[in-house]
């Protein structure tokens, strides 16, 4: 893999999920990689072990003699010392998605897009290809248990990429096959309204070449609305009977989901995946559809999906000893994702009391979707809401916005037992009291609530009878 005369790549914010994946791919492809991040983490440590030079904090000195600087949408480029230093030296400065698009030119790209399900679907396709004897190159915005990381550099012709719609990043990619797994309003700091988001997804779909194909989940109304605007070959999937590839007879038992797949109205196979919930049926159908397009045998597709071990932070069971409580860590941060996670917990563990622990992510998202979060959480037996994880936003810019908006919305939606607990220590103590047999604690959010989930699992292990 070559990028002209580029040998050294500097990555600003190298510890982020998407940026660390690029760093891994570049390292495994023989490039020299340097980078910076504000704090040390397990991710930055792993990159250092692989040969990356990682600096803590941002400084003009960090860029050294690199050939290009790559930064993510989470970095305020106009305020970053490293970006400014590179521009002053005449070093090219590009966003993550542009680098991804360049790396894709060497492979047949399978790009997985959608408001929800991108990470899991990308990992399912990768696992399926590996099981079929292919050797794909893979980049996922999360940690795959099967890949033991977020990337894989293979020798085969396929490159499987998670395509992010935030900041219109996916429009820089060069897919041969494109998946649109879901679509609804999200990223209000990028898209003014749903029409702007629709336009971006149509543009993404139409980037596929004439010989490629776009796979659309028709269970989503917004996906159905944009299909007539696509001018590429299409393939539909879903639980809707009109789909080319349809799932029926869905059973959810604990962490396992089983369903029958019909292809063009004919029964094709019975499928089992180690991922609970109807939303994961959509993810698996997307993988099956791409597998059929690539000419993989049905038996190979089914066995490949059966070997899928799951994703970190995607309904990840951190503790589940028989006779004890169940602790689940989930990345859900959009109302539909929260609703799907709660439904999966209800369906898979019908005898358990479901305690939904939710940390809102971003003030802008909390403001836009507070009522929707309330409805999504209302199906839980008990709701505990933490304060907002600010991430790239500043608290001062959003006066009066807190997790209490979500807690109040949950009460209005009919939830019976709701608590807003902004203090972390108090939240941890409260949740430890719920770690008893018969309870399932579902910790959700894109922020540091994952640390709380791990602490609760440790608490359960230490207090085993």
Swiss-Prot record:
Catalytic activity: UDP-N-acetyl-alpha-D-muramate + L-alanine + ATP = UDP-N-acetyl-alpha-D-muramoyl-L-alanine + ADP + phosphate + H(+)
Record GO cellular component, one term: cytoplasm
Main subcellular localisation: cytoplasm
EC number: 6.3.2.8
Protein family per UniProt: Belongs to the MurCDEF family.
Function, in words: Cell wall formation.
The protein's name: UDP-N-acetylmuramate--L-alanine ligase
Organism (species): Chlorobium phaeobacteroides (strain BS1)
